Amino acid sequence: MSISGTLSNYYVDSIISHEGEDPNASRFSNVQYSSARQPGPGEHPEFPSCSFQPKPPVFSSSWSPFSSHASNGLPAVYHPYIPTQPVPSTDTRYLRTWLDCAPRAEPLPGQGQVKMEPLLGHLGEPPKLVGQHEYILESSTAREINSGHSAGFEDNKDICEGSEDKEGPDQNDPSANWLHARSSRKKRCPYTKYQTLELEKEFLFNMYLTRDRRHEVARLLNLTERQVKIWFQNRRMKMKKMNKDQPKE
């Protein structure tokens, strides 16, 4: 009967509770009645509220992190301690030098003719060169092939022009002058018998050539106008010398 009476009182009080009152207050006010009853076989027992005991602080209140620094006269900022790395032994040091990749070094002055490899860039970008200068090695045979060939004279003309255009030794170097000593006179340009005969015929016909006639003779004999002009000048000087020597005899 006591259990039924407490249950009826609990439900009656919960129904009659006013709207303005806190429902939690009325609920907790009847805990003293409900705590006296024994739990039934289908009900869970009610446990008292848990109370935790406060744990003692890890550090005492008298300890302060800055008191030791201030007493010792050290700066307040804390710098972490970084241990120094131990020096490896000689065997491991040499082994690491073999394993590590050697860095790319700048080309030495003696290595200027080596072509630098381009560096790989991102997709869509042209490769960049490190050295920035590209040297092209060209042989003497390739240089002769690439050089332009002048259109045409015979073998005697090529010999004459080659002798005139030959580069002499360095004038500032006395040893070169002594080693390559030669006469200052240029090599004479030989003419063929056919060219000499035609020039003699033209000279007997006219000692002085006009510009148009000189151009035509040079074209027919495969000579330059300068060669024809010089030959006529020499031939006139030779004839004057012969005319001067004839009266004396």
Curated annotation (Swiss-Prot):
Assigned keywords, A-Z: Developmental protein, DNA-binding, Homeobox, Nucleus, Transcription, Transcription regulation
GO CC annotation terms, alphabetical: nucleus
Region (Disordered), start-end ranges: 146-182
Function of the protein: Sequence-specific transcription factor which is part of a developmental regulatory system that provides cells with specific positional identities on the anterior-posterior axis.
Superkingdom in the source lineage: Eukaryota
Family that this chain belongs to: Belongs to the Abd-B homeobox family.
Residue ranges of the annotated DNA-binding region, renumbered to this chain: 184-243
InterPro entries: Abd-B_homeobox_TF, HD, HD_metazoa, Homeobox_CS, Homeodomain-like_sf, Hox9_activation_N, HXA9/HXB9/HXC9
Ranges of compositional bias, category Basic and acidic residues: 152-169
Protein name as catalogued: Homeobox protein Hox-B9a
GO molecular function: DNA-binding transcription factor activity; DNA-binding transcription factor activity, RNA polymerase II-specific; RNA polymerase II cis-regulatory region sequence-specific DNA binding
Organism: Danio rerio
Gene: hoxb9a
Main location: nucleus
Compartment list: Nucleus
BP-aspect Gene Ontology terms: anterior/posterior pattern specification; DNA-templated transcription; embryonic skeletal system morphogenesis; proximal/distal pattern formation; regulation of transcription by RNA polymerase II
